Amino acid sequence: MSDYKVNEATIAKKAELVDVYAQKMTEAASIVVADSRGLSVDQDTQLRKQLREAGVEFKVVKNSVLRRAAEKAGLEGLSEAFSGPSAVAFSNEDVVAPAKVLADFAKDAENLEIKAGVIEGKVSSKEEIQAIASLPSRDGLLSMLLSVLQAPVRNVALAVKAVAEKEESAA
């Protein structure tokens, strides 16, 4: 017989962690799982700063906790990404932000590898996450929409101004 005893307090803490991360996964607009092994302390600090500025939460969590949390959140397909060291980036606001920051950072830091992710509740592959990263941010998309909506009004204003100037010069 083994003298190993199960520590009830440790099990309770892990169950609580699973609940916390399952809730984060359920509420998140997007999640990106990455392997940040091999980043220097300076690179890791820079990455965390950029993610924080973008409103993204970045955590390194045990794979067993993440796997159970993903199952509890109904994201079973994400469990395959939890092998080797895993860091998870959560965003509740901007769907593109975690993918964009991590993909941009990975261009300079070869040791950062995106594994998979979740976009609005759908498990996505590494390739899909990188495609999302190439999209403009929410603010960028809104500014593009605004300029498209303003164009007809601007054209009408210019046409009215041209007619007014033509009539003034004719008079």
Swiss-Prot record:
Belongs to the universal ribosomal protein uL10 family. InterPro entries: Ribosomal_uL10, Ribosomal_uL10-like_sf, Ribosomal_uL10_bac, Ribosomal_uL10_bac_type, Ribosomal_uL10_CS_bac. Forms part of the ribosomal stalk, playing a central role in the interaction of the ribosome with GTP-bound translation factors. One of its GO terms (biological process) is translation. This is Large ribosomal subunit protein uL10. The keyword Ribosomal protein applies. The keyword RNA-binding applies. Keywords: Ribonucleoprotein, Ribosomal protein, RNA-binding, rRNA-binding. The lineage of its organism: Bacteria, Bacillati, Bacillota, Bacilli, Lactobacillales.
